[in-house]
């Protein structure tokens, strides 16, 4: 078993990257995926929401994510998630908005590295009511 295969088995065992898990994704990765992404100088990470519905089979497979933003999004297919930042943060009570218009495939190899993708320890997963809204969004139903 080579080192990449061992790393994959370790990541697959330790990390829950299933639908509804919340992450902090380095802006460099978002910029690589979205040409119009604006990287603010005082912010290195943006929230990510996994919409992965299947098991990842290898280290170079991808986990589909939705990009979160503090800019209010309007529309019928928008999820608002609160309390993603620590309580001491000025962003704690501000919602992050997710839209299904921009899913982004991120390689499993990036997960668990503090300079690329880290799990949101403040809020690792959507709450049940938020999960219901996400399911409606992904099925194309009005939220």
Language-model-detected regions and their locations in the chain:
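A generic secondary-structure signal marking the coil-to-beta-strand transition
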Residues: 19-21, 61, 96
């Amino acid at each position: 078993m080579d080192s990449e295969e061992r790393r994959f088995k370790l990541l697959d065992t330790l990390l829950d990257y299933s639908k509804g898990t919340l992450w902090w994704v380095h802006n460099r990765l978002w910029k690589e995926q979205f040409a119009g992404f604006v990287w603010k100088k005082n912010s290195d990470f943006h929230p990510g929401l996994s919409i992965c519905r299947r098991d990842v089979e290898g280290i170079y497979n991808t986990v589909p994510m939705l990009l979160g933003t503090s800019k209010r999004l309007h529309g019928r297919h928008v999820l608002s998630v609160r309390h993603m930042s620590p309580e001491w943060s000025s962003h704690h009570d501000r919602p992050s908005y997710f839209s299904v218009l921009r899913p982004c495939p991120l390689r499993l190899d990036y997960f668990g590295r503090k300079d690329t993708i880290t799990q949101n320890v403040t809020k690792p997963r959507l709450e049940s009511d938020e999960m219901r809204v996400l399911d409606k969004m992904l099925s194309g139903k009005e939220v």
